Amino acid sequence: RAFAAAGQALQAFQLEDVSFHPYSSKFDLYIGNKIGGVLTPAEARGLKVFADPNGGNCASCHYQGAGLNGSTALFTDFSYEAIGVPRNAALPVNADPGYVDLGLCGPARTDHPPTPGNRFCGMFKSPTLRNVASRRSFFHNGIFHSLEQTIRFYNTRDTMPELWYPTVGGQAKATPDPDFPGYGLITTQYVGGQVRKFDDLPARFVGNIDTQMPLDGRPAHSKPPMSEQDIADLLCFLNTLNDKDVQPAEPPKPGACTS
């Protein structure tokens, strides 16, 4: 009992003493109503996109409010989600077509066997978004290397899956159509063929895929949840989550986040 009590005391100390969590981002100044914490119009709009259940809806998994004990927002609800991230061919383990990382169902874990109907297969933990703009790899397999591309995946995973997943069959166009975006993992446009959506998840677990906005399973080539302005504003807001001594991987262009 004494050992458990000592652990609880240490936990309380680490939660309450600011030296263990010296949050110094612009967002922290904003919520603390401190000097330097005034969000620009673009950042404020980005916060609205972040929280909008019909827009970015980022807050559904990356909760931006204080904890139950009043602790500073960690920008994660510590939940697990399956969102069908594309397979990363650059990983040596993926040279084996039979290898699949099922997250909670292994192979690194053994407490959730990958049996049909297991709703945990394909799920990975929602990470904190603090200092997210400083990262150069995203998701469990590091498939994306920019924050903007990651946001665009969320926005068009369902509306333009051909940008993110391989197409089987069909004929490659020598020159893509002018309206074919160049920001995806797949830069070749195909006529015909079948898009292998969720190519890193066995078909028996596709039912575990998250269907919350913006990943709501809307029809292909329909209007995506976020506009270009929404994406730009959201990027501006996410940059406010970097602590003052942390440099962004891709700093916003001068003036991009001011108005």
PLM regions with names:
Residues 1-259:
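Periplasmic c-type cytochrome electron-transfer domains
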